[in-house]
Amino acid sequence: MSTFINPDFLLGNKFARELYHESAENLPIIDYHCHLIPQQVAENHKFADITEVWLGGDHYKWRALRGNGVDEDYITGGRSSREKFEKWAETVPYTMRNPLYHWTHLELARVFGIYDILKPETADYIYNRCNELLASDDFRAQSLMKKFNVETVCTTDDPTDTLEWHKRIAEKPFGVNVLPTWRPDKMLGIDDPENFRKYVAKLSGITGIMISGYQDALDALQKRHDFFGQMGCRLSDHGMDTFYAEDCTREEADRIFRKAMQGQMPDCKEIAKFKSAILLDLAAMDCKSGWTQQFHIGPIRNNNRKMFERLGPDTGFDAIDDKPVAAAGHKFFSKLAYEDNLGKTILYNLNPKDTEVMATMAYTFNDGKTAGKMQYGAAWWFLDQEDGMRKQLNALSSLGLLSRFVGMLTDSRSFLSYPRHEYFRRILCSMLGDDIQSGRLPESELPFIHKMVGDICYRNAKEYFQF
């Protein structure tokens, strides 16, 4: 058994160890942004094997496997579960210094009690042991969530989703709150008129509202927004390449909407105008309902045409975009603030060039009424690793108030990803412990720093989202 994942992993001094073990380690988890499948939660899904629960749908691992020269047949193809796992075990040693190496061994330790290093020599034992445990009811979906002391999760849901699985969970509670998140990205897809028309027809069908113009679409969205609120929704989310803040009248938005609904492609300026208009209207809905809006900014998606046609989206072929965000972002939030339509907001950047940009953008629009109203969010996606977390925490500390931060989230499709909260907590305590050790923070203020750790890891999120 390896001592790699030990009680003091990443905790380099006595202050870091004290902060983590006394004020972070045992706190509940609020996972306010994830991509779990609600049906699997509602049905208390039993996983067939470790390959399904660990490798299925995990584009982080898929990218690493491809980078290690593993054929696609062992990744998304028809090879057996054991063969796919063996290829992952062969790849893990080559992921050293990639966050996958830490995540892999934290998950093995925390979920399965396995402290061995995963490599070809240990693959058989680990595969068999994990599958033996997964055959037990103690390793079904709901049990895994309770195992990690998860208090609340927020899934990611389209406005046309029925939320039937959330309803079923609420009717048969199991100790974890599972709430929907409003993600209306498809209503911004006016640059693909064919699919946009199909989506509007779907929205019309579920609301019973005949949608012929822009105001009809807003009425239908408001009806679904109200329904999401009734189902416990407290957050919205937008995944975008950049911000949009073009001036657009209601009449212009209606004309552009009707143009797309007739199957015509709007020009680039019209696309930007429409996206700007609907984002402002959606933000106003969120503000009125007291929700928190999230903006995940900066991916360029589906870049490998051959593989996109073969596998579809979200399969490991996205990357970091380099569009400017500052001017449009500030103009967008300035409009909302001027019209008193700016509610709680979290900003996430994917391109590290935008780290300080986003941190300062957030703190330009606080109103002096709600502590931490505008948040610079956790390191996201390609930046969700130790270096990225430290840079995000340092930027927030230098340009805002770390003490008001709402903390970590998994952004994951996997029920095994909750150790990412532990990883964040250890890194946070390591940084603060180093500051105390070096004299940058006063040891005399340890009681407040302990409180600050607990706030960041749990209490701030609970209060901020009103869970």
Task: Write out the residue ranges for each language-model feature.
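Short glycine/proline- and charge-enriched loop/turn segments
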Residues: 308-316
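Short, basic/hydrophobic alpha-helical segments
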Residues: 332-338
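C-terminal amphipathic alpha-helical interaction region
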Residues: 293-295
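Divalent-cation-assisted or electrostatically stabilized phosphate/pyrophosphate-binding catalytic cores
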Residues: 322-329
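Metal/cofactor-centered catalytic core regions of large enzymes
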Residues: 270, 316-319
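Hard-cation-handling environments
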Residues: 299, 304
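Metal-cofactor-binding active-site regions of metalloenzymes
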Residues: 2-289, 341-343, 347-352, 356-359, ...
